[in-house]
Swiss-Prot record:
SMART domains: Adenylsucc_synt
A Gene Ontology cellular-component term: cytoplasm
Keyword Signal listed: no
Cross-referenced InterPro entries: Adenylosuccin_syn_GTP-bd, Adenylosuccin_syn_Lys_AS, Adenylosuccinate_synth_dom1, Adenylosuccinate_synth_dom2, Adenylosuccinate_synth_dom3, Adenylosuccinate_synthetase, P-loop_NTPase
Record-listed IMP binding positions: D13, E14, G15, K16, N38, A39, G40, H41, T130, R144, Q224, T239, R303
Name assigned to this protein: Adenylosuccinate synthetase
Enzyme Commission code(s) on record: 6.3.4.4
Keyword annotations of the record: Cytoplasm, GTP-binding, Ligase, Magnesium, Metal-binding, Nucleotide-binding, Purine biosynthesis
Matches recorded under CDD domains: AdSS
PROSITE patterns (alphabetical): ADENYLOSUCCIN_SYN_1, ADENYLOSUCCIN_SYN_2
Length: 430
């Protein structure tokens, strides 16, 4: 019996929510291990639709424990708001179904403000952040000046920690010509939310180790996608954390040998939100058609996603950098009815052929996709639940993707409904 890590194999928005929800039915514990409330996902459970940004998917499922690990940066007010929103939908979040790492870094209002100032004040060099303070909070974590969840339980220790934090942030604010923030303002912000979030704190690394030793099935839920990884993504147009599967260990406190099966999620085409290179992006009516059929708008921001053909080079890179054992291929039904479908198999950069996207930002901008054209299919894949339900050419398309990325398709999703899934291999039974 394996534990399972779910990671996005592209630039996020791959449909992880549905796959995690489908897998969480078999899991005892669901763990968030990186990111913050900057990436959302939609869960469809029966007739109910839940939109989560910070809470693990397990909290909406009975008898499943949701865990927010130390690798997550936590906005305590966003957490309280999301808990209240679920309560309005009839889902009670308590210590019985949610624990938060006591050493998780907190996102404060000054982080959100700094994030927005940088993004709005950088014409032509925007990264495409959600302005929710994720990056600045990670900066403070690495700079060893962050306020952590456990600090709220010891209010008498907060003043010197706030003083250290503001020594940095007020210097930045002076540079922006902004009024400095007082220590009392931050203290009030922290003490005002403490009683809402402290009941969930726990020593998560020990909790997860006990669960593992007790034979519990643990599902690690990644946010964003591996191509947004701060090291392995299209830097600097990336998120502020590691999003590859290895972060599941670091961001939860569980040893790397306990991670188990790595399931990568990839769309049957490619999308991206915000700025950054996108070799297969389509600016024509085909790209518009894919976006409209796939309802490609961000869960958190509502931003329109950029759309393009499937990029086998990028997913193949992700298979290697995340150690992916199998792929869940989503939104195959969006490609129904295309006469032909193109897949990027290599790049041409200044006359030289590359089988991967170089780390150089300049080279990425000059990368021209080399395509293989595959016949489309006239039948429908929407709602298919077995191979027998799929058009023959759709099966050929899936098999060709497997060959190009060097990993098998373990699950195939054919609609947003959780049961419209074709299972080839159950990751928990690896």
């Amino acid at each position: 019996m394996a534990n399972v890590v779910v990671v996005g194999a592209q630039w996020g928005d791959e449909g992880k929510g549905k796959i995690v929800d489908w897998l969480s039915e078999q899991a005892d514990v669901v763990v968030r291990f990186q990111g913050g409330h900057n990436a959302g996902h939609t869960l469809v459970v029966g007739e109910a639709v839940y939109k989560l940004s910070l809470l693990p998917s397990g909290v909406v499922r009975p008898n499943t424990l949701g865990v927010i690990g130390n690798g997550v940066v936590l906005d305590p007010y966003a957490l309280a708001s999301e808990i209240d929103r679920l309560a309005g939908q009839g889902v009670t979040v308590s210590r019985e179904n949610l624990r938060v790492a006591d050493n998780a870094t907190l996102i404060l209002s000054l982080h959100r403000e700094l994030d927005a100032l940088r993004e709005d004040g950088a014409p032509g060099t925007k990264i495409g952040t959600t302005k929710r303070g994720i990056g600045p909070a990670y900066e403070d974590k690495v700079g060893r000046r962050a306020i952590r969840l456990m600090d709220l339980a010891e209010p008498e220790t907060l003043p010197p920690k706030i003083e250290r934090l503001l020594a940095h942030h007020n210097a930045l604010r002076r540079g922006f010509g902004l009024e400095e923030i007082s220590e009392q303002t931050i203290l009030d912000e922290l003490t005002g939310i403490a009683e809402r979030v402290l009941p969930y704190q726990d020593t998560v690394w020990r909790l997860l180790d006990d669960a593992r030793r007790g034979g519990k099935r643990i599902l690690f839920e990644g946010a964003q996608g591996a191509l947004l990884d701060v090291d392995h993504g299209t830097y600097p147009f990336v998120t502020s954390s590691n999003t590859v599967a290895g972060q599941a260990a670091t961001g939860s406190g569980l040893g790397p040998r306990a991670i188990g099966y790595v399931l990568g999620i990839a769309k049957a085409y490619t999308t991206r939100v915000g700025e950054g290179p996108f070799p297969t992006e389509l600016h024509d009516e085909i790209g518009q058609r894919i976006g409209e059929r796939g309802h490609e708008f961000g869960t958190v921001t509502g931003r329109k996603r950029r759309c393009g053909w499937f990029d086998a080079c990028l997913v193949r890179q992700t298979v290697k950098t995340s150690g992916i054992d199998g792929i869940a291929l989503t939104k195959l039904d969006v490609l129904d009815g295309f006469d032909e479908i193109r897949v990027c198999t290599a790049y041409d950069i200044d006359g030289q052929r590359f089988d991967h996207l170089p780390a150089s930002q300049a080279a990425q901008q000059r990368a021209v996709p080399v395509y293989e054209t595959i016949p489309g299919w006239s039948g429908t894949t929407a709602g298919a639940r077995s191979w027998a339900d799929l058009p023959a050419q759709a099966i050929k398309y899936v098999r060709r993707i497997e060959e190009l990325i060097g990993a098998p398709v373990a699950l195939l999703s054919t609609s947003p409904e959780r049961d419209d899934t074709i299972l080839m291999h159950n990751p928990f039974e690896d």
